[in-house]
Swiss-Prot record:
InterPro entries: ATP_synth_asu-like_sf, ATP_synth_asu_C, ATP_synth_asu_C_sf, ATP_synth_F1_a_nt-bd_dom, ATP_synth_F1_asu, ATPase_a/bsu_AS, ATPase_F1/V1/A1_a/bsu_N, ATPase_F1/V1/A1_a/bsu_N_sf. The keyword Membrane applies. This is ATP synthase subunit alpha. Belongs to the ATPase alpha/beta chains family. Keywords: ATP synthesis, ATP-binding, Cell inner membrane, Cell membrane, CF(1), Hydrogen ion transport, Ion transport, Membrane, Nucleotide-binding, Translocase, Transport. Its main location: membrane. Its EC number is 7.1.2.2. It comes from the Bacteria. It is found in: Cell inner membrane. One of its GO terms (cellular component) is proton-transporting ATP synthase complex. It catalyses: ATP + H2O + 4 H(+)(in) = ADP + phosphate + 5 H(+)(out). ATP binds at residues 169-176.
Length: 513
């Protein structure tokens, strides 16, 4: 068989057309040093700040220091088997974590991988952990409440949806307990929760997860864990990962609550990473950008407008605002709120709940100091009934503290002063609350009404607790309709006032406590 020149040229053209050249250009570099979870890489020309660098063994590092002749990167995970001379590659991606409803009820690590043994997670996609916070135009003012279930917080330091409220205090003052109770109280409110545990013992986190499960709140919660045994890099990135998971709900017109427990440990982890990267230390050896570390995280907690949600969802969700409420926790040393990290976070947040060791040890729990605790925006979001009835509580406590200090030196007190002291003691006793026992709006309203209208005047101080328990049991049993109505509307008017007054008068006349 003979082929002429035309057929030969056609065959060659066909072969050339069918030939598939698959070429991938990798930007590669070489590890020149490994120490304490930090690698220095030579030869990465086009690496971005915060870019993921692929390491041998399906691991990643994040490029944090871009220097003239090398790149400083922090390894995400074990680094003992990394050695000089190993080849690494740029990925062209920044760190992303899985997001979506499939994460609810699950315990994940900083990278979004499940660590609860319940199998793979069905996520709705991935989101970068570092996102620019919504701008001023995209935000809406805070006017809906987040009920924590604590009388002292909801009455005196109310929290709104989209607010950042700091919980600050020494170790063992009930900071985590308050945050966990706030999460438990959201199980029927429709607010999705994210709990970020940073630098804690694995046993402590397991206990928290068990408590959430016992109180039917885990199904509504994502738990993000970076234990004390994990690398400093994973501890410092955990809050950003949790925030990205919470933003998924905010950007789709839903409400979410995120707890960072705690940002002091995150700042320490970031300080460790920065010092290992040889960045210049500043006050308390923290790097110069530790304020920015927390501000860019907490600014992402916001209430976004319906226009923002509609634009984000391409018109799928209309007329709904979304919110992400943050409860960051800071641990102080011997009550020193003027240290570097506490003052930073106080200045970033919209108020703080200050928990005191002395109050905690004297049996006042939650150990809230109403004098220096404040909510800067929550008042606009407070439920009507609680707003109306809680006005006198803060005043009564302030007068009581002043008089209590004065009465130590005075031998004889007039009748009016004695009454004020007695009322202050009873209000203080009334604001005590057990852990894992959040109260509904109606229950809080009833108790505050009793204090405000003088129904406690003839109740002995030692019997305040039993009086409250009996009153709530009676109201839930015999006046369930009224309680349900208050819970539903949160309103307070003349009719409700008369009903509450009648309820209390009947209770005191017919019941014992």
């Amino acid at each position: 068989m003979q082929l002429n020149s035309t057929e030969i040229s056609e065959l060659i053209k066909q072969r050339i057309a069918q030939f598939n050249v698959v070429s991938e250009a990798h930007n590669e570099g070489t590890i020149v040093s490994v120490s304490d979870g930090i690698i220095r890489v030579h030869g990465l020309a086009d690496v971005m700040q915060g870019e993921m660098i692929a390491l041998p063994g399906n691991r990643y590092a994040i490029a944090l220091n871009l220097e003239r002749d090398s790149v400083g990167a922090v390894v995400m995970g074990p680094y003992a088997d990394l050695a000089e001379g190993m080849t690494v590659k740029c990925t062209g991606r920044i760190l992303e974590v899985p997001v979506g409803r499939g994460l609810l009820g699950r315990v994940v690590n900083t990278l979004g991988a499940p660590i609860d043994g319940k199998g793979a997670i069905d996520n709705d996609g991935f989101s970068p952990i570092e996102v620019i916070a919504p701008g001023v135009i995209d935000r809406q003012s805070v006017d809906q409440p987040v009920q924590t279930g604590y009388k002292s917080v909801d009455a005196m330091i109310p929290i709104g949806r989209g607010q950042r409220e700091l919980i600050i205090g020494d170790r063992q003052t009930g900071k985590t307990a308050m945050a966990i109770d706030a999460i438990i109280n959201q199980r029927d409110s429709g607010i999705k929760c994210v709990y970020v545990a940073i630098g804690q013992k694995a046993s402590t986190i397991a206990n928290v997860v068990r408590k959430l499960e016992e109180h039917n709140a885990l199904a509504n919660t994502i738990v993000v864990v970076a234990t004390a045994s994990e690398s400093a890099a994973l501890q410092y990135l955990a809050p950003y990962a949790g925030c990205a998971m919470g933003e998924y709900f905010r950007d789709r017109g839903e409400d979410a609550l995120i707890v960072y427990d705690d940002l002091s440990k995150q700042a320490v982890a970031y300080r460790q990473v920065s010092l290992l990267l040889r960045r210049p230390p500043g006050r308390e050896a923290f790097p110069g950008d530790v304020f920015y570390l927390h501000s860019r995280l907490l600014e992402r907690a916001s209430r976004v407008s319906a226009d923002y949600v509609e634009r984000f969802t391409n018109g799928e969700v209309k007329g709904k605002t979304g919110s992400l409420t943050a409860l960051p926790i800071i641990e102080t040393q011997a009550g020193d709120v003027s240290a570097f990290v506490p003052t930073n976070v106080i200045s970033i947040t919209d108020g703080q709940i200050f928990l005191e060791t002395n109050l905690f040890n004297s049996g006042i729990r939650p150990a809230v100091n109403p004098g220096i605790s404040v909510s800067r925006v929550g008042g606009a979001a407070q439920t009507k009934i609680i707003k109306k009835l809680s006005g006198g509580i803060r005043t009564a406590l302030a007068q009581y503290r002043e008089l209590a200090a004065f009465s130590q030196f005075a031998s004889d007190l007039d009748e009016a002063t004695r009454k004020q002291l007695s009322h202050g003691q009873k209000v203080t006793e009334l604001l005590k609350q057990k852990q894992y026992a959040p109260m509904s709006v109606a229950q809080q309203g009833l108790v505050l009404f009793a204090a405000e209208r003088g129904f406690l005047n003839d109740v002995e101080l030692a019997k305040i607790g039993s009086f409250e328990a009996a009153l709530l049991a009676y109201a839930d049993r015999d006046h369930a309709e009224l309680m349900a109505d208050i819970n539903q509307s949160g309103n307070y008017n003349g009719e409700i006032e008369e009903k509450l007054k009648g309820l209390l008068e009947t209770f005191k006349a017919t019941q014992s406590w």
